[in-house]
UniProtKB/Swiss-Prot annotation:
Belongs to the peptidase M10A family. The gene is MMP1. The conserved cysteine present in the cysteine-switch motif binds the catalytic zinc ion, thus inhibiting the enzyme. The dissociation of the cysteine from the zinc ion upon the activation-peptide release activates the enzyme. The modification Phosphotyrosine is found at residue 360. CDD domains: HX, ZnMc_MMP. The lineage of its organism: Eukaryota, Metazoa, Chordata, Craniata, Vertebrata. This is Interstitial collagenase.
């Protein structure tokens, strides 16, 4: 087993470019990470045979493929850099394929009025902060279902919550700082429904380390009968991602309501949906180039692609730029300055790589000279040959000279006049290889700036290598 994984790692390193050669010590550490990960979360040794003695190399490859498919990675059966990166991220301790099931079938609570008890408290936070985090986590689920939760201070509750470390006698020991943050058991008698948090982590109520409210909301989903979701935007996604806004996605809501039924509220709650890159109806809020790559923005997500790696990276905007808001409305790159600008409302942010530049956000009226009637920018693009930036606002476009730092006279003009054929509204635009690509709804127009002609008309998501659009 060890030698097989080492061989797979060597093959990955041989075939990769731009990465330093891994040392034998690093390779051994990576082998150990892969072994432990597949054992803990993908049931690699479910037959009782120790991992180190397994001789069925096909099983290892299949488990790697299973993990890669779950996380939306390129399915190779090899522990490549992307796979290892996901394996090294902090996450929930509940397996992705072998659930903590105490009863057969799909466990659920028969009673919808449940009790919970916090057995002990972490010293990282005040008792009030812990109580509030747990209460809010339960409230997320009660808001979208018929479930109610009552805190008790003594005796046995349906859901017992505790902070423990290492081996805490439930056959699922914690692993110290990082890695496995917490776990919870599905509904059932005894330990069923209980949630355990690793005391070796540092629990917080903000962005630092691990936000207790965020982790508790996930774990209590397991306590209610939910398994992990492959939807990166779902609260039940296994890896820890904290964006500052803890909310249930539509996937989470659909899951809990499939078990317990809809909320008793007269207006049924709904949650944000994660973009499906190959959805033919996909639209974009903003698009920009970034150091040779393309960045597409939708709600709280970005989609990242380039010509060298066909897989689309989908993640939260806040993971890449914590200081940049969700719901961006426009973006453009000035490549020779290595600078990208993001717009929302009357503010804009300038970034270099993953860093927001000092002094931002700034006001669009003061920086660019827009009149007060312009409340926001719909789309923007920097035209490299002329050094001009085009801003699209409703049916008009403005032209800004980046080097003179002033608006050009004669603008605004009607979009249909300046860029004939693309319509009178632009959702997003970028320049690549000398052409402009305009987006409106599900349509994309390739535009030749020199001849003022449309060259092609395609689906908006044609950059994502989808088989069908």
């Amino acid at each position: 087993m060890f030698s097989l994984l080492l061989l797979l790692l060597l093959l990955c390193n041989t075939g990769s470019h731009g990465f330093p050669a891994a040392t034998s010590e690093t390779q051994e550490q990576d082998v150990e990470i892969v072994q432990k990960y597949l054992k803990n979360y993908y049931n690699l040794n479910s037959d009782g045979v120790p991992v180190e003695k397994k001789r069925n190399s096909g099983l290892v490859v299949e488990k790697l493929k299973q993990m890669q498919q779950f996380f939306g990675l390129k399915v190779t059966g090899k522990p490549d850099a992307e796979t290892l990166n996901v394996m090294k991220q902090p996450r929930c301790g509940v397996p992705d394929v072998a659930e903590f099931v105490l009863t057969p079938g799909n466990p659920r609570w028969e009673n919808t009025h449940l009790t919970y008890r916090i057995e002990n408290y972490t010293p990282d936070l005040s008792r009030e902060d812990v109580d509030r985090a747990i209460e809010k986590a339960f409230q997320l689920w009660s808001n979208v279902s018929p479930l109610t939760f009552t805190k008790v201070s003594e005796g046995q509750a349906d859901i017992m919550i505790s902070f423990v470390r290492g081996d805490h006698r439930d056959n699922s020991p914690f692993d110290g700082p990082g890695g496995n943050l917490a776990h919870a058991f599905q509904p059932g008698p005894g330990i069923g429904g209980d949630a355990h948090f690793d005391e070796d982590e540092r629990w917080t109520k903000n962005f630092r380390d691990y936000n207790l409210y965020r982790v508790a909301a996930h774990e209590l989903g397991h306590s209610l009968g939910l398994s992990h979701s492959t939807d990166i935007g779902a609260l039940m996604y296994p890896n820890y991602i904290y964006t500052g806004d803890v909310q249930l996605s539509q996937d989470d809501i659909d899951g809990i309501q499939a078990i317990y039924g809809p909320s008793e509220n007269p207006v049924q709650p709904s949650g944000p949906q994660t973009p499906q890159v190959c959805d033919s109806k996909l639209t974009f809020d903003a698009i920009t180039t970034l150091r040779g790559e393309l960045m597409f923005f939708k709600d709280r997500f970005y989609m990242r692609t380039n010509s060298f790696y066909p897989e689309v990276e989908l993640n939260f905007i806040s993971v890449f730029w914590p200081q940049v808001p969700n719901g961006l409305q426009a973006a453009y790159e000035i490549a020779d300055r290595d600078e990208v600008r993001f717009f929302k409302g009357n503010k804009y942010w300038a970034v270099r790589g993953q860093d927001v530049l000092y002094g931002y956000p700034k006001d669009i009226h003061r920086s660019f000279g827009f009149p007060s009637t312009v409340k926001n920018i719909d789309a923007a693009v920097f035209e490299e040959d002329t050094g001009k930036t085009y801003f699209f606002v409703a049916h008009e476009c403005w032209r800004y000279d980046e080097y003179k730092q002033s608006m050009d006279t004669g603008y605004p003009k009607m979009i249909a006049e300046e860029f004939p054929g693309i319509g009178n509204k632009v959702d997003a635009v970028f320049q690549k290889d000398g052409f402009l690509y305009f987006f409106h709804g599900t349509r994309q127009y390739q535009f030749d700036f020199k001849t003022k002609r449309i060259l092609t008309l395609q689906k908006a998501n044609s950059w994502f290598n989808c088989r069908k659009n």
